[in-house]
From Swiss-Prot:
Pathway: Porphyrin-containing compound metabolism; chlorophyll biosynthesis
EC number in record: 6.6.1.1
Name of the gene this protein is made from: chlD
Chain intervals with Pro residues compositional bias: 332-347
Protein name: Magnesium-chelatase subunit ChlD
Location of the region described as Disordered in the Swiss-Prot/TrEMBL record: 328-387
Lineage: Bacteria, Bacillati, Cyanobacteriota, Cyanophyceae, Synechococcales
Pfam family name, one: Mg_chelatase
Gene Ontology molecular function terms on file: ATP binding; ATP hydrolysis activity; magnesium chelatase activity
Length: 676
């Protein structure tokens, strides 16, 4: 027996959205094949990103589930059932299962979601009553066979995003926690949106999602006017507005249902697979996800058109939707290969020319007399998209590819995990003293044992023991500290100091957004002095760097130790996650550390300054700091020790006799990006 649950959608019709044809096609393909791999829509505010995501949900057909099942299990597919359902209906024939039809779910993941809320946890109330751990489904369980929507994907916690995509890739959620082992299906259509102005999306996440497009394409005047008219009409009377598109929406719903059936019959030939792989190679894609996603997209396109065979246009569209946005070559296509020169004409060419023309005329006459044969559409495109003379692409595809290239290796700064301050990420088993108790997780851990504990202590309502206590794992964003260590001795000292000062001012202009801090330590004479403590203040930097000390000896050992101490103190503050030491020096220190610290050096003993420097470099590496050595001396006078110093610290060495503030700042940025 089947029960039908009524549902009246009020989402903006997808057919009423002006423009965005590539995105609408991608969403339709996702509706046909929810296991496609997900769709990401990038765009600024007001570009209908979330409107399109919700609009496609209206087109999804209702789903039949086992009546009362919390995981939307398909009664015809026992292979995808959760553990409880498999155990409960192990001996029940499929045709005797009681079912119901419900709307496909639409679940939105909030930005502050915890791991327990996403993946599921212990149901405290039921566990207390039953005396055993009972699983409470999370958001991923509720989204099975529906739409899982993430707004502002770029702002979602990295660990949460990785766990979410792992579950979607595997198609199931395996829970192993608090004395409980359980698995349930999770196969929704993933749709995510984000605004690039609020921060870039990590390339790692982008690589795990099938289709990524931009909604920032420029609309013409007529299209903008039409879009405004549509929005006003919908706001005035949503039901009347939707009624105008009922016929179109019904046609699309039918198309999706039929296409899902066609999809079961669609297959690719080996030649077509080779074409997609070749396009991925030409586009410079890393890994195999690109071509695998493109194969599923091509099959979904054929199914959408009501065909079981994949044609050349299907492959071309799949490349545009999947491979092009991933390409690293769109901004710099390879130069065209020069065609070989034509062979020289034979000496008797003129003599045989008339005879060849007569033969050609005879062939054309024969062709005219033959019946016209029907030509099948080609199964493989005649040219590659990643050719120098490539085909024209949809602006939304190209825009996203170029945007991803501009993004480069930039991304969110590091995060710091702690147990004292930050955003609550997940509960953890405490090691030692618990600074902040996770009350929710503690109660869940204690709930299965309440029944037995009350027998021992009938006068107490809730009994929590030491083994139930869970702590909070907290996370907060952290910036980077760039410590400029500048050799202020010698004739070129002033040039080095001016370049470092310019780099400091450049990086400080970007410091607020990234939470970065900058410090400057010149070393000259007998010791090194922290001229600019870690700061994000441009005003403070200008004031402190008005006078630049120069001349004297080169106490490089003391300078490196000062930089290490500044970095360690900054990390202890909890606001800094990465430390980069940029040493602008040739590596020729001539003042031992003991002398800089005021310690007595035994008479007749000569300190090994080189060994001292290498020991400090090893310490820098052990502390997880990055060392960049920039040698501004000319190559023919360089000792080469600066390179050895950088290698010992696991850092990088640059020979730049004419180092500029822009170049130094760029190297520091790259070092931070490499540490992420």
């Amino acid at each position: 027996m089947t029960t039908l649950t009524p549902f009246i959608p009020l989402n903006f019709p997808i057919t009423a959205i002006v423009g965005q044809e590539a995105i609408k096609l991608a969403l339709l393909l996702g509706a046909i094949d929810p296991g496609l791999g997900g769709i990401v829509i990038a765009g600024r505010r007001g570009t209908a990103k979330s409107v399109m995501a919700r609009a496609i949900h209206t087109l999804l057909p209702p789903i039949e589930i086992i009546k009362g099942n919390r995981y939307q299990c398909d009664p015809k597919n026992p292979g995808s059932w959760d553990d409880d359902t498999l155990e409960k209906f192990a001996d029940v024939p499929l045709d005797q299962l009681e079912t119901q039809v419900i709307p496909a779910p639409f679940i939105q993941i909030p930005l502050g979601v915890t791991e327990d809320r996403l993946l599921g946890s212990v149901d405290v109330e039921k566990s207390v009553k039953q005396g055993e751990a009972v699983f409470q489904p999370g958001l991923l369980a509720q989204a099975h066979r529906g739409v899982l929507y993430i707004d502002e994907l770029n702002l979602l916690d990295d660990q949460i995003a990785n766990q979410l995509l792992t579950v979607l890739t595997e198609g199931k959620n395996q829970i192993e926690r608090e004395g409980m082992s359980f698995q349930h299906p999770c196969q929704p259509l993933l749709i995510a949106t984000y605004n690039p102005e609020e921060g870039p999306l990590r390339r790692h996440l982008l690589d795990r999602i099938a289709i990524a497009l931009s909604a920032d394409g420029i609309l013409g005047l007529d299209q903008r006017v039409a879009a405004v008219d549509q929005v006003l009409a919908y706001a005035d009377s949503p039901i009347s507005f939707i009624d105008q598109y009922d016929a179109e929406l019904d046609d699309l719903k039918t198309t999706i249902i039929l296409a899902r059936e066609w999809l079961k019959e669609v297959s690719l030939t080996p030649e077509q697979v080779s074409y997609l792989v070749e396009e991925a190679i030409r586009g410079g894609l890393q890994g195999h996800r690109g071509e695998l996603f493109a194969m599923r997209v091509a099959k979904a396109i054929a199914a959408l058109d009501g065909r079981s065979d994949v044609q050349a246009d299907d492959l071309r569209q799949a490349v545009e939707l999947v491979i092009v946005p991933r390409s690293v070559l769109m901004d710099n296509p390879p130069p065209p290969e020069q065609a070989p020169p034509p062979p020289p004409p034979p000496q008797n060419q003129d003599e045989g020319k008339d005879e060849q023309e007569d033969q050609q005329d005879d062939k054309e006459d024969d062709k005219d007399n033959e019946p016209e044969a029907e030509q099948d559409p080609p199964s493989i495109p005649e040219e590659f998209i990643f050719d120098p003379e490539g085909v024209s692409l949809d602006p939304s595809v190209l825009y996203f590819a170029q945007m991803a290239q501009k993004q480069g290796k930039s991304g969110s700064r590091s995060v710091i995990f702690s147990d004292d301050r930050g955003r609550y990420l997940k509960p953890i088993l405490p090691k030692g003293k618990v600074r902040r108790i996770a009350v929710d997780a503690t109660l869940r851990a204690a709930s299965p044992y309440q029944k037995s504990r009350r027998l021992r202590h009938p006068d107490r309502q809730v009994i929590v023991e030491q083994g139930d206590i869970r702590g909070k794992k907290l996370v907060r964003k952290a910036g980077a500290l760039i410590v400029f260590l500048v050799d202020a001795s010698g004739s070129m000292a002033l040039n080095r100091m001016q370049a470092a000062k310019g780099a400091v001012m450049q990086l400080l202009t970007e410091a607020y957004e990234n939470r970065d801090q900058v410090s400057l330590i010149p070393f000259q004479g007998e010791n090194a002095e922290v001229l600019l403590p870690p700061t994000r203040s441009i005003a403070m930097a200008k004031k402190r760097l008005e006078t630049l000390p120069c001349g004297g000896g080169s106490p490089l050992s003391h300078g490196l130790m000062q930089a290490v101490n500044v970095g360690m103190n900054a990390k202890r503050s909890g606001d800094i996650g990465q430390v980069v030491i940029v040493a602008i020096t040739d590596g020729r220190g001539n003042i031992p550390l003991a002398r800089s610290l005021g310690d007595e050096i035994p008479e007749g003993e000569k300190p090994d300054i080189k060994a001292e420097l290498l020991e400090i470099a090893a310490k820098i590496r052990g502390l997880g700091m990055q060392l960049l050595v920039i040698n501004t001396e000319k190559k023919f006078v360089s000792t080469g020790f600066g390179k050895e110093l950088a290698q010992k610290a696991g850092g990088k060495y640059y020979q730049l006799p004419k180092a500029t503030d822009q170049g130094i700042a760029s190297m520091a940025r790259q070092a931070i990006a490499d540490m992420q």
